[in-house]
Every structure is written in structure tokens, then in C-alpha cells.
Amino acid sequence: MQNDAGEFVDLYVPRKCSASNRIIGAKDHASIQMNVAEVDKVTGRFNGQFKTYAICGAIRRMGESDDSILRLAKSDGIVSQNF
């Protein structure tokens, strides 16, 4: 679909689970989206950037969401590797 400026735009872009790469459906009311703020290492203040993680309801239902978020945070460098 095109807008008035002639650019191609999508009507709906589905979210994907950060842990399993599954598409999060519109009726998945158990899914969460979490923003983790990045802070300056010296001052400890918010620097205006954040990482976004989306976890689908199936992962939460299995009880694997905490491990998945920790694994994703380690890979992004938010949590130290030896935690």
C-alpha cells in the first residue's frame, strides 16, 4: 500500500518474540514487551537509549521468560557474561 507521498507502507507489522522468533498474534494477551534502559557507566544516568524485548505468551506459559530475558540481556551486553 502507498501513502500520499508515494512511499510504500505496511498496514500492520506484527511483533516477533525475541526469544523464540515466533510472531506474536493480536490475541496473545499473555505476551509482554519490556524496555530496558541503557545507562552511562560513569554517571549511572539514563542516556536516552533502550533495548526492547518482546516475550510471547507460550514462553511465559512454560516458565522460561526469566531465563530468556537473561540470555538476551547477556548477548546485548546489558548483563555481564559471568552472572
From Swiss-Prot:
Protein keywords: Acetylation, Cytoplasm, Endoplasmic reticulum, Isopeptide bond, Ribonucleoprotein, Ribosomal protein, Ubl conjugation
GO biological process, any: translation
GO molecular function, one term: structural constituent of ribosome
Linked residues for Glycyl lysine isopeptide (Lys-Gly) (interchain with G-Cter in SUMO2): K41
Family: Belongs to the eukaryotic ribosomal protein eS21 family.
PTM-bearing positions, type N-acetylmethionine: M1
Listed name of the protein: Small ribosomal subunit protein eS21
Role: Component of the small ribosomal subunit. The ribosome is a large ribonucleoprotein complex responsible for the synthesis of proteins in the cell.
Superkingdom assignment: Eukaryota
Record-linked PANTHER family: 40S RIBOSOMAL PROTEIN S21 (PTHR10442)
Disulfide bridge map: none
Major localisation: cytoplasm
Complexes and interactors: Component of the 40S small ribosomal subunit.
Entry-linked PROSITE patterns: RIBOSOMAL_S21E (PS00996)
InterPro entries assigned: Ribosomal_eS21 (IPR001931), Ribosomal_eS21_CS (IPR018279), Ribosomal_eS21_sf (IPR038579)
Subcellular location: Cytoplasm, Cytosol; Cytoplasm; Rough endoplasmic reticulum
